[in-house]
């Protein structure tokens, strides 16, 4: 494990992400209950239980399993939400927004556990599901119709959430690249045994 991806940093990042997702699902649960969208609030109960148990996965350092289960939950949740309410609410955007998380999780897990999360497979699966939900709405339409103002507000919220996820993942990856380059330059410029500048440093 390199200096950037310490176990403490891994645990902290996963706890923050898990808490963020748990709070989102609590908010969605309230929304679905308020508007009597039965299938979704039942599904959200299982989602909230899963994210409550997510802290156990982090504690046991089961990061690859955790990221893959998060991917499955997000895909199922957003596909079902889009089928119930349609694409106008922006739930399908999470299928796009989570793709950087899969690749970040893949690298993260490889550094900490030496296990893959299969980011490419999950990304392709998200793309397929994204197309499927749009095609399904085109031919069938949503099961529930809610006020246009509510639809607009939820769509904005989903957009903000997905932008936040993408920005966070990209900023962490850039931070890692910079840290890795600095470490490589340090190793190239200084002798590992004597800690003195070597001939490459002189160049």
Question: Language-model features: where?
Answer:
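Short, Lys/Arg-rich, polar N-terminal cytosolic tail immediately upstream
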Residues: 1-7
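Hydrophobic alpha-helical transmembrane segments of multi-pass membrane proteins
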Residues: 7-64, 70-71
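Hydrophobic alpha-helical membrane-embedded or membrane-associated segments
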Residues: 16, 125-126, 163-167
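Hydrophobic transmembrane alpha-helices
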Residues: 21, 25, 50-51, 57, ...
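Transmembrane helix-loop junctions in multipass membrane proteins, especially transporters and channels
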Residues: 33, 37-40, 59, 63, ...
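Alpha-helical transmembrane segments of polytopic membrane proteins
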Residues: 41-47, 152-162
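Juxtamembrane or sensor-core-proximal signal-transducing alpha helices
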Residues: 157-185
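Conserved nucleotide-binding and Mg2+-coordinating catalytic segments in signaling enzymes
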Residues: 186-203
């Amino acid at each position: 494990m390199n200096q950037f991806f310490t176990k403490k940093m891994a645990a902290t990042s996963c706890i923050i992400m898990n808490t963020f997702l748990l709070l989102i699902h609590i908010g969605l649960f309230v929304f679905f209950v308020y508007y009597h969208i039965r299938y979704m609030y039942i599904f959200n109960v299982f989602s909230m239980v899963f994210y409550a148990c997510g802290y156990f996965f982090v504690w046991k350092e089961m990061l690859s399993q955790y990221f893959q289960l998060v991917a499955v939950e997000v895909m199922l949740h957003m596909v079902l939400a889009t089928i119930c309410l349609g694409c106008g609410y922006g739930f399908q955007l999470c299928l796009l927004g989570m793709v950087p998380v899969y690749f970040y999780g893949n690298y993260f897990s490889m550094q900490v556990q030496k296990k893959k999360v299969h980011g490419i497979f999950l990304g392709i699966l998200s793309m397929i599901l994204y197309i499927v939900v749009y095609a399904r709405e085109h031919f069938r339409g949503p099961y529930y119709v809610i006020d246009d103002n509510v639809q607009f507000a939820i769509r904005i919220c989903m957009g903000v959430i997905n932008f936040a996820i993408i920005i966070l993942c990209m900023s962490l990856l850039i931070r890692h690249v910079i840290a890795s380059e600095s470490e490589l330059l340090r190793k190239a410029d200084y002798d590992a045994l004597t800690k003195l500048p070597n001939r490459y440093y002189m160049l």
